[in-house]
Amino acid sequence: MPKRTDIQSILILGAGPIVIGQACEFDYSGAQACKALREEGYRVILVNSNPATIMTDPEMADATYIEPIHWEVVRKIIEKERPDAILPTMGGQTALNCALALEKHGVLAEFGVEMIGATADAIDKAEDRSRFDKAMKSIGLECPRADTAKSMEEAYKVLDMVGFPCIIRPSFTMGGSGGGIAYNREEFEEICTRGLDLSPTNELLIDESLIGWKEYEMEVVRDKNDNCIIVCAIENFDPMGIHTGDSITVAPAQTLTDKEYQIMRNASLAVLREIGVETGGSNVQFGINPKDGRMVIIEMNPRVSRSSALASKATGFPIAKVAAKLAVGFTLDELMNDITGGATPASFEPTIDYVVTKIPRFNFEKFAGANDRLTTQMKSVGEVMAIGRNQQESLQKALRGLEVGAAGLDEKVDLDAPDALTKIRYELKEAGAERIWYIADAFRAGMSVDGVFNLTNIDRWFLVQIEELVKLEAEVKAGGFAGLNQDVLRKMKRKGFSDARLSKLLGVSENEIRRLRDQYNIHPVYKRVDTCAAEFKSDTAYMYSTYDEECEANPTDKDKIMVLGGGPNRIGQGIEFDYCCVHAALALREDGYETIMVNCNPETVSTDYDTSDRLYFEPVTLEDVLAIVRVEKPKGVIVQYGGQTPLKLARALEAAGVPVIGTSPDAIDRAEDRERFQQAVQRLGLKQPDNATVTAIEQAIEKSREIGFPLVVRPSYVLGGRAMEIVYDEQDLRRYFNEAVSVSNESPVLLDRFLDDATEVDVDAICDGERVVIGGIMEHIEQAGVHSGDSACSLPAYTLSQEIQDKMREQVEKLAFELGVRGLMNIQFAVKDNEVYLIEVNPRAARTVPFVSKATGAPLAKIAARVMVGQTLEQQGFTKEIIPPYYSVKEVVLPFNKFPGVDPLLGPEMRSTGEVMGVGATFAEAYAKAELGCGSVYPEGGRALLSVREGDKQRVVDLASKLVKLGYQLDATHGTAVILGEAGINPRLVNKVHEGRPHILDRIKNHEYTYIVNTASGRQAIEDSKVLRRGALAHKVNYTTTLNAAFATCMSHTADAKASVTSVQELHARVKANQA
């Protein structure tokens, strides 16, 4: 049946900010849904609070609202836009929960809005654990023994039934949030209390443990005529007990017999029918006991998910796009498959003749004190996917694409160390982020496949594959470079060995291996992802490399530009950089260039087969990029858009004769190399905080006496502030050198005078060699010392004088010309006592580019991409800075709730995973919306606790009187209370934890506070007050760790975040009117 004509406009709910467990795969699905529905002629209204997404670009929908995904705000949008239908299956758990709230509060009924894609009942049946259990029993499928509990009392009753170990999961949460595995009563109590607190319905599911079982996922699509297809069967390499988002996964499933596959296939179709998913994609998870083959169903998601993004990229079948069309009445046989150019309908199940491996990317090094063992709560922040002709090639490509410094199965353990075996056994049994490398070490240490299986429960088939790779490495090592003949080298390349890994095994340079390959003419060929195992001709250039005979790349001789993507998401390099890469591809495609994308992140829009003309799904390493350049011969390569990943390759690419366009690699180096940069700064006569570069600890102490404390210390060349700290005295400085870094002539350490209480400012600008245009000046809300990626910011600036801003504009222009920037640049300043200090310059796309583009309506990444290929700013009509007639505030989202034990104090090391944007007529309204967007709801009044550091005591009086005016009663710790008392404000005095009971923590646990302001500096003070911040986090009390944020919060109390809604299109029209 063709599409429905009784609905004209559809509201799509996005997923909001990126958090662990819900990342940019929902930008990919939402963007696809917008495109699919608009090409069918529907009016699309989109709501998403995350500005760093492609789906919130003004061209993607008819009306785009960057507003909080909160049911009261969405009600305002429904009232204004009057959509006929709402599609909630594209925005993850956030969108489902919001849709259920709209249903519950009667909003959908009030405005006559129909839910499409999934009914409220189907969502509820799949999400509500007890209803799901009953439903599965009714169709003869077994679930793990389990029951729900709404209190600790009930939880203990369930425990008697399931026994230890048991798995605890809160209802309606995402990425296993708040869940875990309990092995004893103490852990059981801790996880249950946390889980009851985190579940929006205060309900837990307690399951028997299936630890060590095999885990599978089926991606299923069903239409309203009951046509069903399995898009992909995914097998988890890691067994049950590790969240599937943290597992290495493989597609197609490798260890199922055909009979088992058919049983599972039939079961998944039965699940969709029973739950009532009539239109769209779902993912169904199964566990199989390897001992007796008992199969249980673990859960199903009645929506597009992380796995469906992976399945789409793995097969070339666009699940989200198809699901969106099914939601408006199409059936699978009516839709044509794009990849085969319409030669096959969407009702053909994809078949694949290659192996896909996904490996998660973790960031534990950023969370000191976090438990880094993997459990049922998701902890990874990104993922990489690789495609190969066999499991071994696929795995090794994924390992090098991960960018954790591994070129393959690199050694982790020194096997001669006395505790080597103990260490390996621990790492195999208690899985951490690096288990796969320890498995290889176990084989090197002589363990058998059975020995490894007994510790890991990983299927022996996978272990044999790894064991063989380890044996091959040993043979190659023994044969030496001389023994690397044509046959051996070709065999190693077919098994996925990188040049870098071979060079490490043989002790020669990577270049020598590359020369040898050239001599033997051993080069990769490119095969196409075509959904049909080459049965039909593919129109789509979606390629992966392998060492085979026939190459299917068929390059053209058009003018081509190649964009290098950012690889897997991680903290400090996320979706913002992917956004820039997509914009580069779109802009140059519009201008008639053929665009080529190289990336290996399955979650993103950049790896969608129709974002660029040609997509190479390959690791972003020197070897892989050079191989593609050899085949495609592009006219230019863009390295400034994918963050640090491609930037690191700039010099080596240039040396290999690759045309790197935009700012030259030498200019990039002048900005990143401390000494070269200082020469430029001195030549221009600009101010920097006093600083020094040291190569030994004694030298550091001598310099620190000249500069003075506090100091910011960090190793040179880092992104996202790795190993960066603020030290307050000499003793602290010595500790840093002993614990945090190894300092040497090769790796110097930088010391900078820390400008306490300075205001930090970010500026994005574009230079074409003739003129510099400022994209936006953003004033940070958190003071200097908080990493710019973790600070909220306002555009336009909300306190800076015109004079200071003009000083910055002048300096930006000088710097751009001095460094020879062609394209984007980002500059960070600090303002203190009316002086402007230069902190750093990055001649590349920064993470603020999407936010500035949304706030001003100027697509900076597109404009700069055109500058790189030679268009001037004047030709593009972008010649002056746009200052919008409204305020936009960017606020960040932090993942501390996933890492109990980590201090949530903000500092110079970046730890946020995502961002939201709020827009308002005043700064207060914009800030209030941004806070609501990241889920902080500040109650009116109540009791506030103030405990601040020495340097903040002057300003705390002002803050206290503002809080009193807002109706708060105040508590304060001793030092703060004295200052307030002198000013005539008398707070209740409370004890610090070591001062006797009842102390602060008791009061937090009793829910006495609605707001906490706690600032601390100096090692000891930070350590002492950590319990207060952890307590606030654990008991969901709103807290701020900087005074600036506290003042901004007070201001936001004067505005109503839910009062008005404005679309991006309306905002940009206002900007244009204002310009005129």
Curated annotation (Swiss-Prot):
Residues 1-403 are annotated as: Carboxyphosphate synthetic domain. It is an enzyme of class 6 (ligase). GO terms for molecular function: ATP binding; carbamoyl-phosphate synthase (ammonia) activity; carbamoyl-phosphate synthase (glutamine-hydrolyzing) activity; metal ion binding. Its cofactor is Mg(2+); Mn(2+). Mn(2+) 1 binds at Q285, E299. Residues 936-1076 are annotated as: Allosteric domain. Mg(2+) 4 binds at E840, N842. GO terms for cellular component: cytoplasm. Mn(2+) 2 binds at E299, N301. Residues 404-553 are annotated as: Oligomerization domain. Mn(2+) 3 binds at Q828, E840. Its EC number is 6.3.4.16, 6.3.5.5. Gene3D superfamilies: 3.40.50.20, ATP-grasp fold, B domain, Carbamoyl-phosphate synthetase, large subunit oligomerisation domain, Methylglyoxal synthase-like domain. The keyword Repeat applies. Mg(2+) 2 binds at E299, N301. ATP 1 binds at R129, R169, G175, G176, E208, L210, E215, G241, I242, H243, Q285, E299. Mg(2+) 1 binds at Q285, E299. Residues 936-1076 form the MGS-like domain. Residues 133-328, 678-869 form the ATP-grasp domain. The large subunit is composed of 2 ATP-grasp domains that are involved in binding the 2 ATP molecules needed for carbamoyl phosphate synthesis. The N-terminal ATP-grasp domain (referred to as the carboxyphosphate synthetic component) catalyzes the ATP-dependent phosphorylation of hydrogencarbonate to carboxyphosphate and the subsequent nucleophilic attack by ammonia to form a carbamate intermediate. Large subunit of the glutamine-dependent carbamoyl phosphate synthetase (CPSase). CPSase catalyzes the formation of carbamoyl phosphate from the ammonia moiety of glutamine, carbonate, and phosphate donated by ATP, constituting the first step of 2 biosynthetic pathways, one leading to arginine and/or urea and the other to pyrimidine nucleotides. This is Carbamoyl phosphate synthase large chain. The gene is carB.
